[in-house]
Amino acid sequence: MTRFSAMLDACVLVPVTLADTLLRLAEASLYRPLWSARIITETVRAIKEVHPQLSADDIRNRADAMDAAFGDASVTGWEALEHVISLPDPDDCHVVAAAIVGRADLIVTSNVKDYPPDVLAPYHIEVQTPDVFLLNQLDLAPLAVMSALNRQARSSRKPQLTLDTLLDHLATCGTPDFARTAKTQKWRLAAEHQSSHILSSRHRDGL
């Protein structure tokens, strides 16, 4: 079965915490992530500007790790379509072109105004902010999303983040509604832990 696909614009891949969350949900098979070599180039350039303290190698390694983890994410062969697309900002046409070729269901971007619905409608592509996209994922698969967030918090280092602190960081990355809603769903993790503990006890007791 073909998975739901989302083209990730460079602006949602630059914030490290947000990008990590988006990719962890993809790793959990909640959707198929898409990008292009040009989007990655824009991401690398933007990260250098936002985080000048990071070395070029570290930034490039992050991009290479994304491609390695999601081997089918990078869309190719979109260049011929770029000049057919008409957008308020011509520099964004490559994103739509890659989304069309990659058969994306939607584009996740913080700049939704740059992608008019009437331009995307003929290609059956929607546009969503990362806040709306993550809220939808939480609604569709609440436990999977909360589990991914919990793993993300636990894997953080220097300092290690609590789940609440992680969600606070995400709120500053343009996903305030998602962060606020996710905080109300933490009970799912406790319920899952309790259920797993009960099952483990029964298995241990031979029940």
Q: What kind of feature is each model-predicted range?
A:
Residues 92-125:
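Acidic, metal-binding active-site segment of PIN/NYN-like and related structure-specific nucleases
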Residues 30, 71-72, 124:
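A generic structural signal for alpha->beta connector loops
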Residues 18, 91-92:
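Amphipathic coiled-coil/heptad-repeat helices and related helical stalk/stem segments
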Residues 113-203:
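Acidic, PIN/NYN-like endoribonuclease modules and their adjacent C-terminal/linker elements
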